[in-house]
Amino acid sequence: VDIAIAFFPTLAFRKNLIMEHIKNYIDQHKDRFLNELLDLLKIPSVSADSAYAADVMKTAEFVKDKLIAAGADKVEVCPTAGYPIVYGEKIISPNLPTVLVYGHYDVQPATPLELWDTPPFEPTIRKTAIHPEGAIFARGSCDDKGQMYMHVKAFELMMQTNTLACNVKFMIEGEEEVGSSNLGIFVKANKERLKADVVLISDTSILANDLPSIDCGLRGLSYVEVEVTGPNRDLHSGV
């Protein structure tokens, strides 16, 4: 009992030190984190419109550079038949579990522009009744650049504070908003490289702004062609 009493305060003290270290890093770098995200949101990476092809490619390079800066290894802009997939990893031990982070850097078209209070690719921070503490208004701020970049910065924080407790892999695509037609091909071709114990998807919903949520599954896409044959004469609706 005496040993236990002496031991647990040591663990608690160490935990408090780690949390203080993490908090200090966030406080020191949160302005940079925000400015980087705003720069990312300024790039009109609209995958559905070929007029923005250069911007989509520019965004892939942006993500690559930030993964490298965060501490990821083997970072690569992997070509596909469409827009590339950005891959990076940090393997700290083959004996530890591996988390594969998925996200996408492309965005939906911002039309009709007249419905926007501010330009979609000029991010602004505003307080509203729904967001009394302020929120970023821009195309992609919550689908999916905001969430995707949050994971990159969380990874950076864990690297810089020596608190990364598992292996991490990133797979960030540029065609989610147009059906991810090349994602399955990439996954099959790289199944060994992408092996993981769990996949963390940064593109889901929350139940409320003040209620973080974990989604355990998502609907997929289904393309069907339906042929309907009807009667050759008028029928009562109940027949």
Listing of model-derived features with the role each one plays in the protein:
Residues 103-105, 174-175, 202-205, 228-231:
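Fold-independent oxyanion-binding glycine-rich loops
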Residues 213-229:
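Flexible glycine/proline-rich, aromatic-decorated loop/lid segments
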Residues 4-18:
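Short, Lys/Arg-enriched N-terminal segments with co-localized hydrophobic residues
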Residues 132-137, 232-238:
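Short small-residue beta-strand/loop micro-motif enriched in glycine and branched aliphatics
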Residues 207, 216, 223, 237-239:
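Acidic-enriched catalytic cores of C-N bond-cleaving enzymes acting on peptides and small amides
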Residues 140-217:
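Acidic/histidine-rich catalytic neighborhood of metal-dependent amide-processing enzymes
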Residues 20-141, 158-164:
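Acidic/His- and Gly-rich active-site-bordering loop/insert found
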